[in-house]
A protein has these predicted regions:
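Flexible glycine/acidic-rich beta-alpha junction loops that bind and position SAM and/or redox cofactors
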Residues: 91-100, 148-150, 180-185, 395, ...
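Conserved, mostly hydrophobic/aromatic
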Residues: 172, 345, 379, 383, ...
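Conserved alpha-helical substructure of the radical SAM core
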Residues: 392-417
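Conserved SAM/AdoMet-binding glycine-rich loop
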Residues: 30, 46, 66, 409-554, ...
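N-terminal [4Fe-4S]-dependent radical SAM core
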Residues: 2-25, 35, 298, 302-372
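N-terminal pre-triad scaffold of radical SAM enzymes
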Residues: 31-36, 359-387, 420, 590
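Glycine-rich beta-alpha loop elements in corrinoid/cobalamin-binding modules
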Residues: 35, 43, 62-196, 206-248, ...
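Flexible, glycine-rich loop/tail regions that form catalytic "lids" or insertion modules at the edges
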Residues: 28-32, 74, 229-232, 274-275, ...
Length: 651
């Protein structure tokens, strides 16, 4: 397919490709820890295409060499507007290390799966290099790594509580969540300032005449030009925050020149009894400082409770956290994307292929998703260990049927197309099109999960839109079979949907995630009961038998999750023995930034009750729990049984 090798069809990555387009200067340069794959499953490509569609000249520098003379950081020059940085589709530390902190030998987002093509703490490394090379340039960071480190967070790999990544990265603006709207607004704001030649923040003494076009360096970004943009974070000193309080009608914050003082609308939360539920009016919340959180694990747990509660609201508050002599300001998110907005992103001219520079090199992550279709964003499952709701949001944004069919029409023209779709899914495959029956009730809600501890009565559990998509896709003459490769929630299942899924959309194995069998652990995980899994298992076996199929149900399990003891792991092993399972899809818990489970791992406290939670922290403790998965290997099984008999240790 000749078009796949046309360099002008992709976002440029080299000086030569700029010349092919006749460009002398770029507006935005994106640095990514991943290889450049021009596909909507990869964030750098999406952000680049969105900016391109908005009329900006954009280039991507994938996996630059950070070790040598930094020529990869200078080869395209200085952009007119800003540098954009993402570590890639994964946090670079999760990408590099196992739960046991062993270095991984491969990287799915790199040609030939080669490890070592991005640094540890990738966002910080790239940003510091660019700050040194271009001290007066605007730097915007985003992606999952930056997003989940926007406030004080526990870093498992250094075993420390770190401040907002804005501190160590020296970046100016952090875009959290899915960043399409933010980057365009940032580009538009900086572009206006560049055109107007605004260089200094001019605020009249009476605070009436305000020049909003302030983006100068090197003293630091004068954030006035950008401060109203939703879903970003930035740092200011006390004086700048005071000005922001006067200008922000939504927050009503008023500060003295020395810092945050005397505001009746700033809410300070220090005890678990002060609820953030049932409020529809945005406000500003002042967290306890980073320094206080470092000194007290209880303070960090309290801060997290506030952060997670706000992230689950439709009308969230502005969050402010003191760090040293400055303040991190996190603006509330945009409203959930409409179907039309999401469709517009997927209609951009993606090539659905790696950049031609990689030639025929194998990129594992691309091979996995090249014939998959993401039908929606967001997840209302609220699992304790998961980052999806904090990154993509709890509300579901769904694409239209026509948008999905248009993407499949493009995929069929790829040379490798054989007629099979590997996945019609999303973060949780069976949440497509779901929302509250009465959105006014949703606006008053801050539940972390619409499914736990039981399914919300206000949730519209209508599977008709999803079943209709399956029907239309399977009717396409160039589609032989469409599968659901994403995980499904077995606690969100009608009989009609379950039968359609099992009979027509399983490629021999269906992935589900009970995660554990012990009820006390499942409660902490915010997962349904093991009995509910067993009911689904029986239903799955029944439907397979009726249809003459022999498909497997593959459960995912986690060891050493906060709250899990050796005895709980023995119970899991015993349950698997009874069901003749030999667990395959198993993992040891990895604490990742900004999740409830990670907060419990670090503090030993449940942030919502302040009760102590048992945590297996040491390498030996984690290995012991993991060994229970391998009960069918005799030597390990005997050792695991001995471990279970030992008294548990509290932290």
């Amino acid at each position: 397919m000749e078009a796949l090798t046309d360099l002008k069809a992709y976002l440029p990555t080299t000086k030569k490709e700029l010349q092919l387009r006749g460009w002398d200067e770029l507006d935005v340069i994106i640095f990514s820890g991943d290889a450049y794959i021009d596909h909507p499953a990869f964030g750098a490509a999406v952000i680049g295409r969105v900016l391109e569609h908005a009329g900006y000249k954009v280039a991507i520098v994938p996996q630059p060499d950070w070790r040598g003379d930094h020529r990869d950081f200078t080869k395209l020059g200085k952009p007119r507007l800003f540098f954009a940085i993402t570590a890639g589709s994964m946090d670079s530390m999760v990408n590099h290390y196992t739960a046991a902190k062993r270095l991984r030998s491969d990287d799915a987002y790199t040609p030939e799966g080669k490890a070592g093509m991005r640094p540890d703490y990738c966002t910080i490394t790239y940003s510091n290099i660019l700050r040194e090379l271009y001290p007066d340039s605007l730097i915007v960071i985003g992606g999952i790594e930056a997003s989940m480190r926007r406030l004080t967070h526990y870093d498992y790999w250094s075993n420390t509580l770190k401040p907002s990544i804005l501190v160590d990265s020296k970046a100016d603006v952090l875009v959290y969540g899915m960043g399409e709207k933010q980057v365009v607004e940032i580009a538009d704001a900086v572009d206006r300032c560049a055109v107007d030649r605004c260089a200094v923040d001019r605020v009249a003494v009476d605070r009436v005449a305000v020049d909003r076009c302030a983006v100068d360096r090197p003293e630091g970004l004068k954030i006035a030009a950008l401060e109203e943009i939703p879903q970003i974070a930035y740092m200011v000193d006390g004086v700048e925050l005071s000005r922001s309080g006067v200008e922000w009608s939504r927050s009503g914050v008023e500060l003295s020149s020395s810092g945050v003082e005397g505001s009746s609308n700033v809410q300070h939360y220090s005890t678990p009894t002060q609820s953030l539920l049932n409020t529809t009016q945005p406000q500003t919340i002042l967290l306890r400082s980073h320094e206080e959180a470092v000194k007290s694990k209880r303070v960090h747990a309290e801060n997290f409770r506030v952060i997670e509660t706000e992230s689950n609201k439709i009308n969230a508050a502005t969050i402010v956290q003191p760090v040293g002599k400055q303040y991190v300001v996190v603006n509330p998110p945009y409203p959930t994307m409409t179907t039309e907005e999401l469709d517009a992103i997927y209609d951009l001219p993606f090539m659905y292929h790696p950049h031609p520079k990689y030639k025929d090199k194998h990129i594992p992550a691309y091979e996995m998703i090249r014939f998959s279709v993401c039908m929606h964003r967001g997840c209302f499952g609220g699992c304790s260990f998961c980052t999806i709701s904090a990154h993509q949001g709890k509300q579901i944004a769904s694409r239209s049927e026509e948008s999905i069919l248009r993407q499949i029409s493009v995929l069929k023209d790829l040379p490798e197309w054989k007629g099979y779709l590997s996945d019609l899914g999303g973060p949780s495959a069976n949440m497509y099109g779901m929302h509250g029956k009465d959105m006014a009730l949703c606006e008053k809600c801050a539940r972390p999960s619409c499914l736990f501890p039981k399914i919300c009565n206000n949730l519209n559990q209508d599977f008709a839109p999803l079943l209709n998509i399956y029907k239309r896709v399977d009717a396409l003459p160039y589609v032989k079979k469409s599968f659901v490769g994403s995980g499904v929630r077995y606690d969100l299942m009608s009989e009609a949907y379950g039968r359609e899924l099992i009979v027509n959309h399983v490629s021999g194995r269906l992935k589900v995630a009970p995660e554990h069998t012990a009820s006390n652990v499942l409660q902490i995980m915010r997962k349904p009961s093991w009995e509910q899994y067993e009911r689904f298992y029986r239903f799955y076996e029944k439907v397979n038998k009726e249809a003459g199929l022999k498909q497997q149900l593959i459960p995912y399990f986690i060891s050493s999750h906060p709250g899990c003891t050796n005895q709980d792991m023995k119970q899991l092993a015993d349950q698997c023995k009874q069901m003749h399972y030999r667990p395959e899809q198993v993992q040891d818990f990895t604490p990742t930034p900004m999740t409830l489970a990670t907060t419990m791992f670090y503090t030993g406290l449940n942030p919502y009750t302040m009760e102590e939670v048992y945590v297996a922290k040491t390498k030996e403790e984690k290995q012991k729990q993991n060994s229970f998965f391998f009960f069918w290997r005799a030597p390990k099984a005997e050792k695991a049984d001995r471990c279970a008999e030992r008294p548990r240790r509290r932290r």
